[in-house]
Curated annotation (Swiss-Prot):
The keyword Nucleus does not apply. GO terms for biological process: ergosterol biosynthetic process. This is Lanosterol 14-alpha demethylase erg11. Pathway: Steroid biosynthesis; zymosterol biosynthesis; zymosterol from lanosterol: step 1/6; Steroid metabolism; ergosterol biosynthesis. Heme binds at residue 442. It comes from Schizosaccharomyces pombe (strain 972 / ATCC 24843) (Fission yeast).
Length: 495
């Protein structure tokens, strides 16, 4: 009897599975995006997409065109590739495309309640305005010497660098730690920076692990890393709350760091930011600032190490603008175009985020076609794909910073719009969007350029180096596209 029941259940399951496969092969609605064929229900194309998103996108585009849907762990993801897809997602209307529903389940356990994607969009825009007010040129001018001081302290004691004349350094091991120190000292203030020397870095790491791909789908799973994530969030939030309360009760003059800035901010209705909101925003700000800088600086140093002649060109540019003594000033960066081109080119080849997503709220027709993207799908755009295509960039996979010398800055004459946190360029029909576009464009872009410019300038002033081995492939197992490690350079100290 039991055997018969098992046989019946297996037969039903087999019949359902055969029907599932046949349905993929035979049912094609010309008004819906084509669905990428997959053998395993629910899992769908998750493995192929997760291993190398750009290879997956190119293979699917060759079969289905620029618009197609793939199943990823139970979710229907509609990819819209190309510059038209970039514009469609980044400039989509709030009523049509929702970022909060795409990301809140991932970000809220890490950042906390009532911040980032755990709030209505109009409140998020106010939060971005508050943070942007603390990311002005006056703050950047004070940040440059702070970054240089942190780098001096770190590099002089690092086992990979130290006081020697030459050595070998593992960039994946050293740069994330160094950028935690520089980002925390500038954006967060002296108290938070001191905390990293007392174990804050371990808490940051535990919190960072909450951004694992599995948490896009199952953020509530009782995994050890998720328990560590929740514990780290509580401790870090408590630390920020104590700093805020201590500052409110002190007679200390306000400084230029972000905590002081947020403590003085008020909503349009006149109410001040709550302390737990400031704490959550500070956690988000630290992770955003450190993630982008850590990933990008590893790529920058690796790519420069593969072409040491560019390091010497940067050195000549630096000597011409700054002199041989490294007395850097923020306002000098505008006179160092090659430095800027190196950052642009690195972000073109290796943008930190490979996929940008929105929840589709109602059926959306694709311009110029009969296809309609159905409500409740997740729309996906991949600007990093267009940034590495021959249609837009000659020898697109080569690291060639000088290519930017001949390109027009699309932002200079682009239409601008204010989403509530200051003017940003509206144009998103571009092959190069490393910081996104539209209402969710990254407000930390200028900080990132200042941060990276200072770190690169310090390395160019102090060292020459070459990459050991070939330029690494990309590790897509994390949310931010880091190189596959180890990534080692052989360095020599300049005389």
């Amino acid at each position: 009897m039991a055997f018969s029941l098992v046989s019946i259940l297996l037969s039903i399951a087999l019949a359902w599975y055969v029907g599932y496969i046949i349905n993929q092969l035979t049912s094609r609605n010309s008004k819906r995006p084509p669905i990428v064929f997959h053998w395993i229900p629910f899992v769908g194309s998750a493995v192929a997409y997760g291993m190398d998103p750009y290879v997956f996108f190119r293979e699917c585009r060759a079969k289905y065109g620029d618009v197609f849907t793939f199943v990823c762990m139970g979710r229907k993801m509609t990819a819209f590739l190309g510059v038209q897809g970039n514009d469609f997602l980044f400039n989509g209307k709030l009523a049509d495309l929702n970022a909060e529903e795409a990301y809140s389940h991932l970000t809220t356990p890490v950042f906390g309640k009532d911040v980032v994607y755990d709030i209505p969009n109009h409140v998020f825009m106010e939060h971005k305005k508050f943070i942007k007010s603390g990311l002005g040129f006056s703050q950047f001018r004070s940040y440059v010497p702070l970054i240089l001081n942190e780098m001096d302290a770190f590099l002089s004691t690092s086992p990979d660098f130290g006081p020697g004349k030459e050595g070998v350094a593992d960039l994946l091991k050293t740069m994330p730690v160094m950028t935690i120190y520089t980002a925390s000292r500038t954006l967060q203030g002296a108290e938070v920076r001191k905390g990293f020397d007392a174990g804050f870095a371990d808490l940051y790491h535990d919190l960072d692990q909450g951004f694992s791909p599995v948490n896009f789908v199952f953020p509530w799973l009782p995994l050890p890393r998720n328990r560590r994530r929740d514990r780290a969030h509580k401790i870090m939030q408590k630390t920020y709350l104590k700093i805020i309360k201590d500052r409110r009760s002190s007679t200390e003059n306000p400084g230029t760091d972000m905590i002081w800035t947020l403590m003085s901010c008020k909503y349009r209705d006149g109410r001040p930011l709550k302390e737990h909101e400031i704490a959550g925003m500070m956690i988000a700000l630290l992770m955003a600032g450190q993630h982008t800088s850590a990933a990008t600086i590893v790529w920058v140093l690796a790519l420069l190490g593969s072409k040491p002649e560019i390091i010497e060109m940067l050195w000549e540019e630096q000597k011409r603008v700054v002199g041989e003594n490294l007395e850097l000033k923020f306002d000098q960066y505008k006179d160092m175009p090659l430095l800027n081109y190196v950052i642009q080119e690195t972000l073109r080849l290796h943008p930190p985020i490979h996929s940008h997503m929105r929840k589709v709220k109602r059926d959306l027709p694709v311009p110029g076609s009969k296809i309609v993207i159905p409500a409740n799908n997740y729309l996906l755009a991949a600007p990093g794909l267009t940034a590495t295509e021959e249609e837009y960039f000659t020898h697109a996979t080569d690291f060639d910073p000088k290519r930017w010398n001949d390109r027009v800055n699309e932002d200079e004459n682009a239409e601008q719009i204010d989403y509530g946190y200051g003017l940003v360029t509206k144009g998103a029909a571009s092959p190069y969007l490393p910081f996104g576009a539209g209402r969710h464009r990254c407000i930390g872009e200028q900080f990132a350029y200042m941060h990276l410019s200072t770190i690169i300038s310090k390395f160019v002033h102090d060292y020459t180096w070459t990459l050991i081995g070939k330029v690494p492939n990309v590790d897509y197992s994390s949310m931010v596209a880091l190189p596959l490690g180890p990534v080692k350079i052989a360095w020599k100290r300049r005389n």
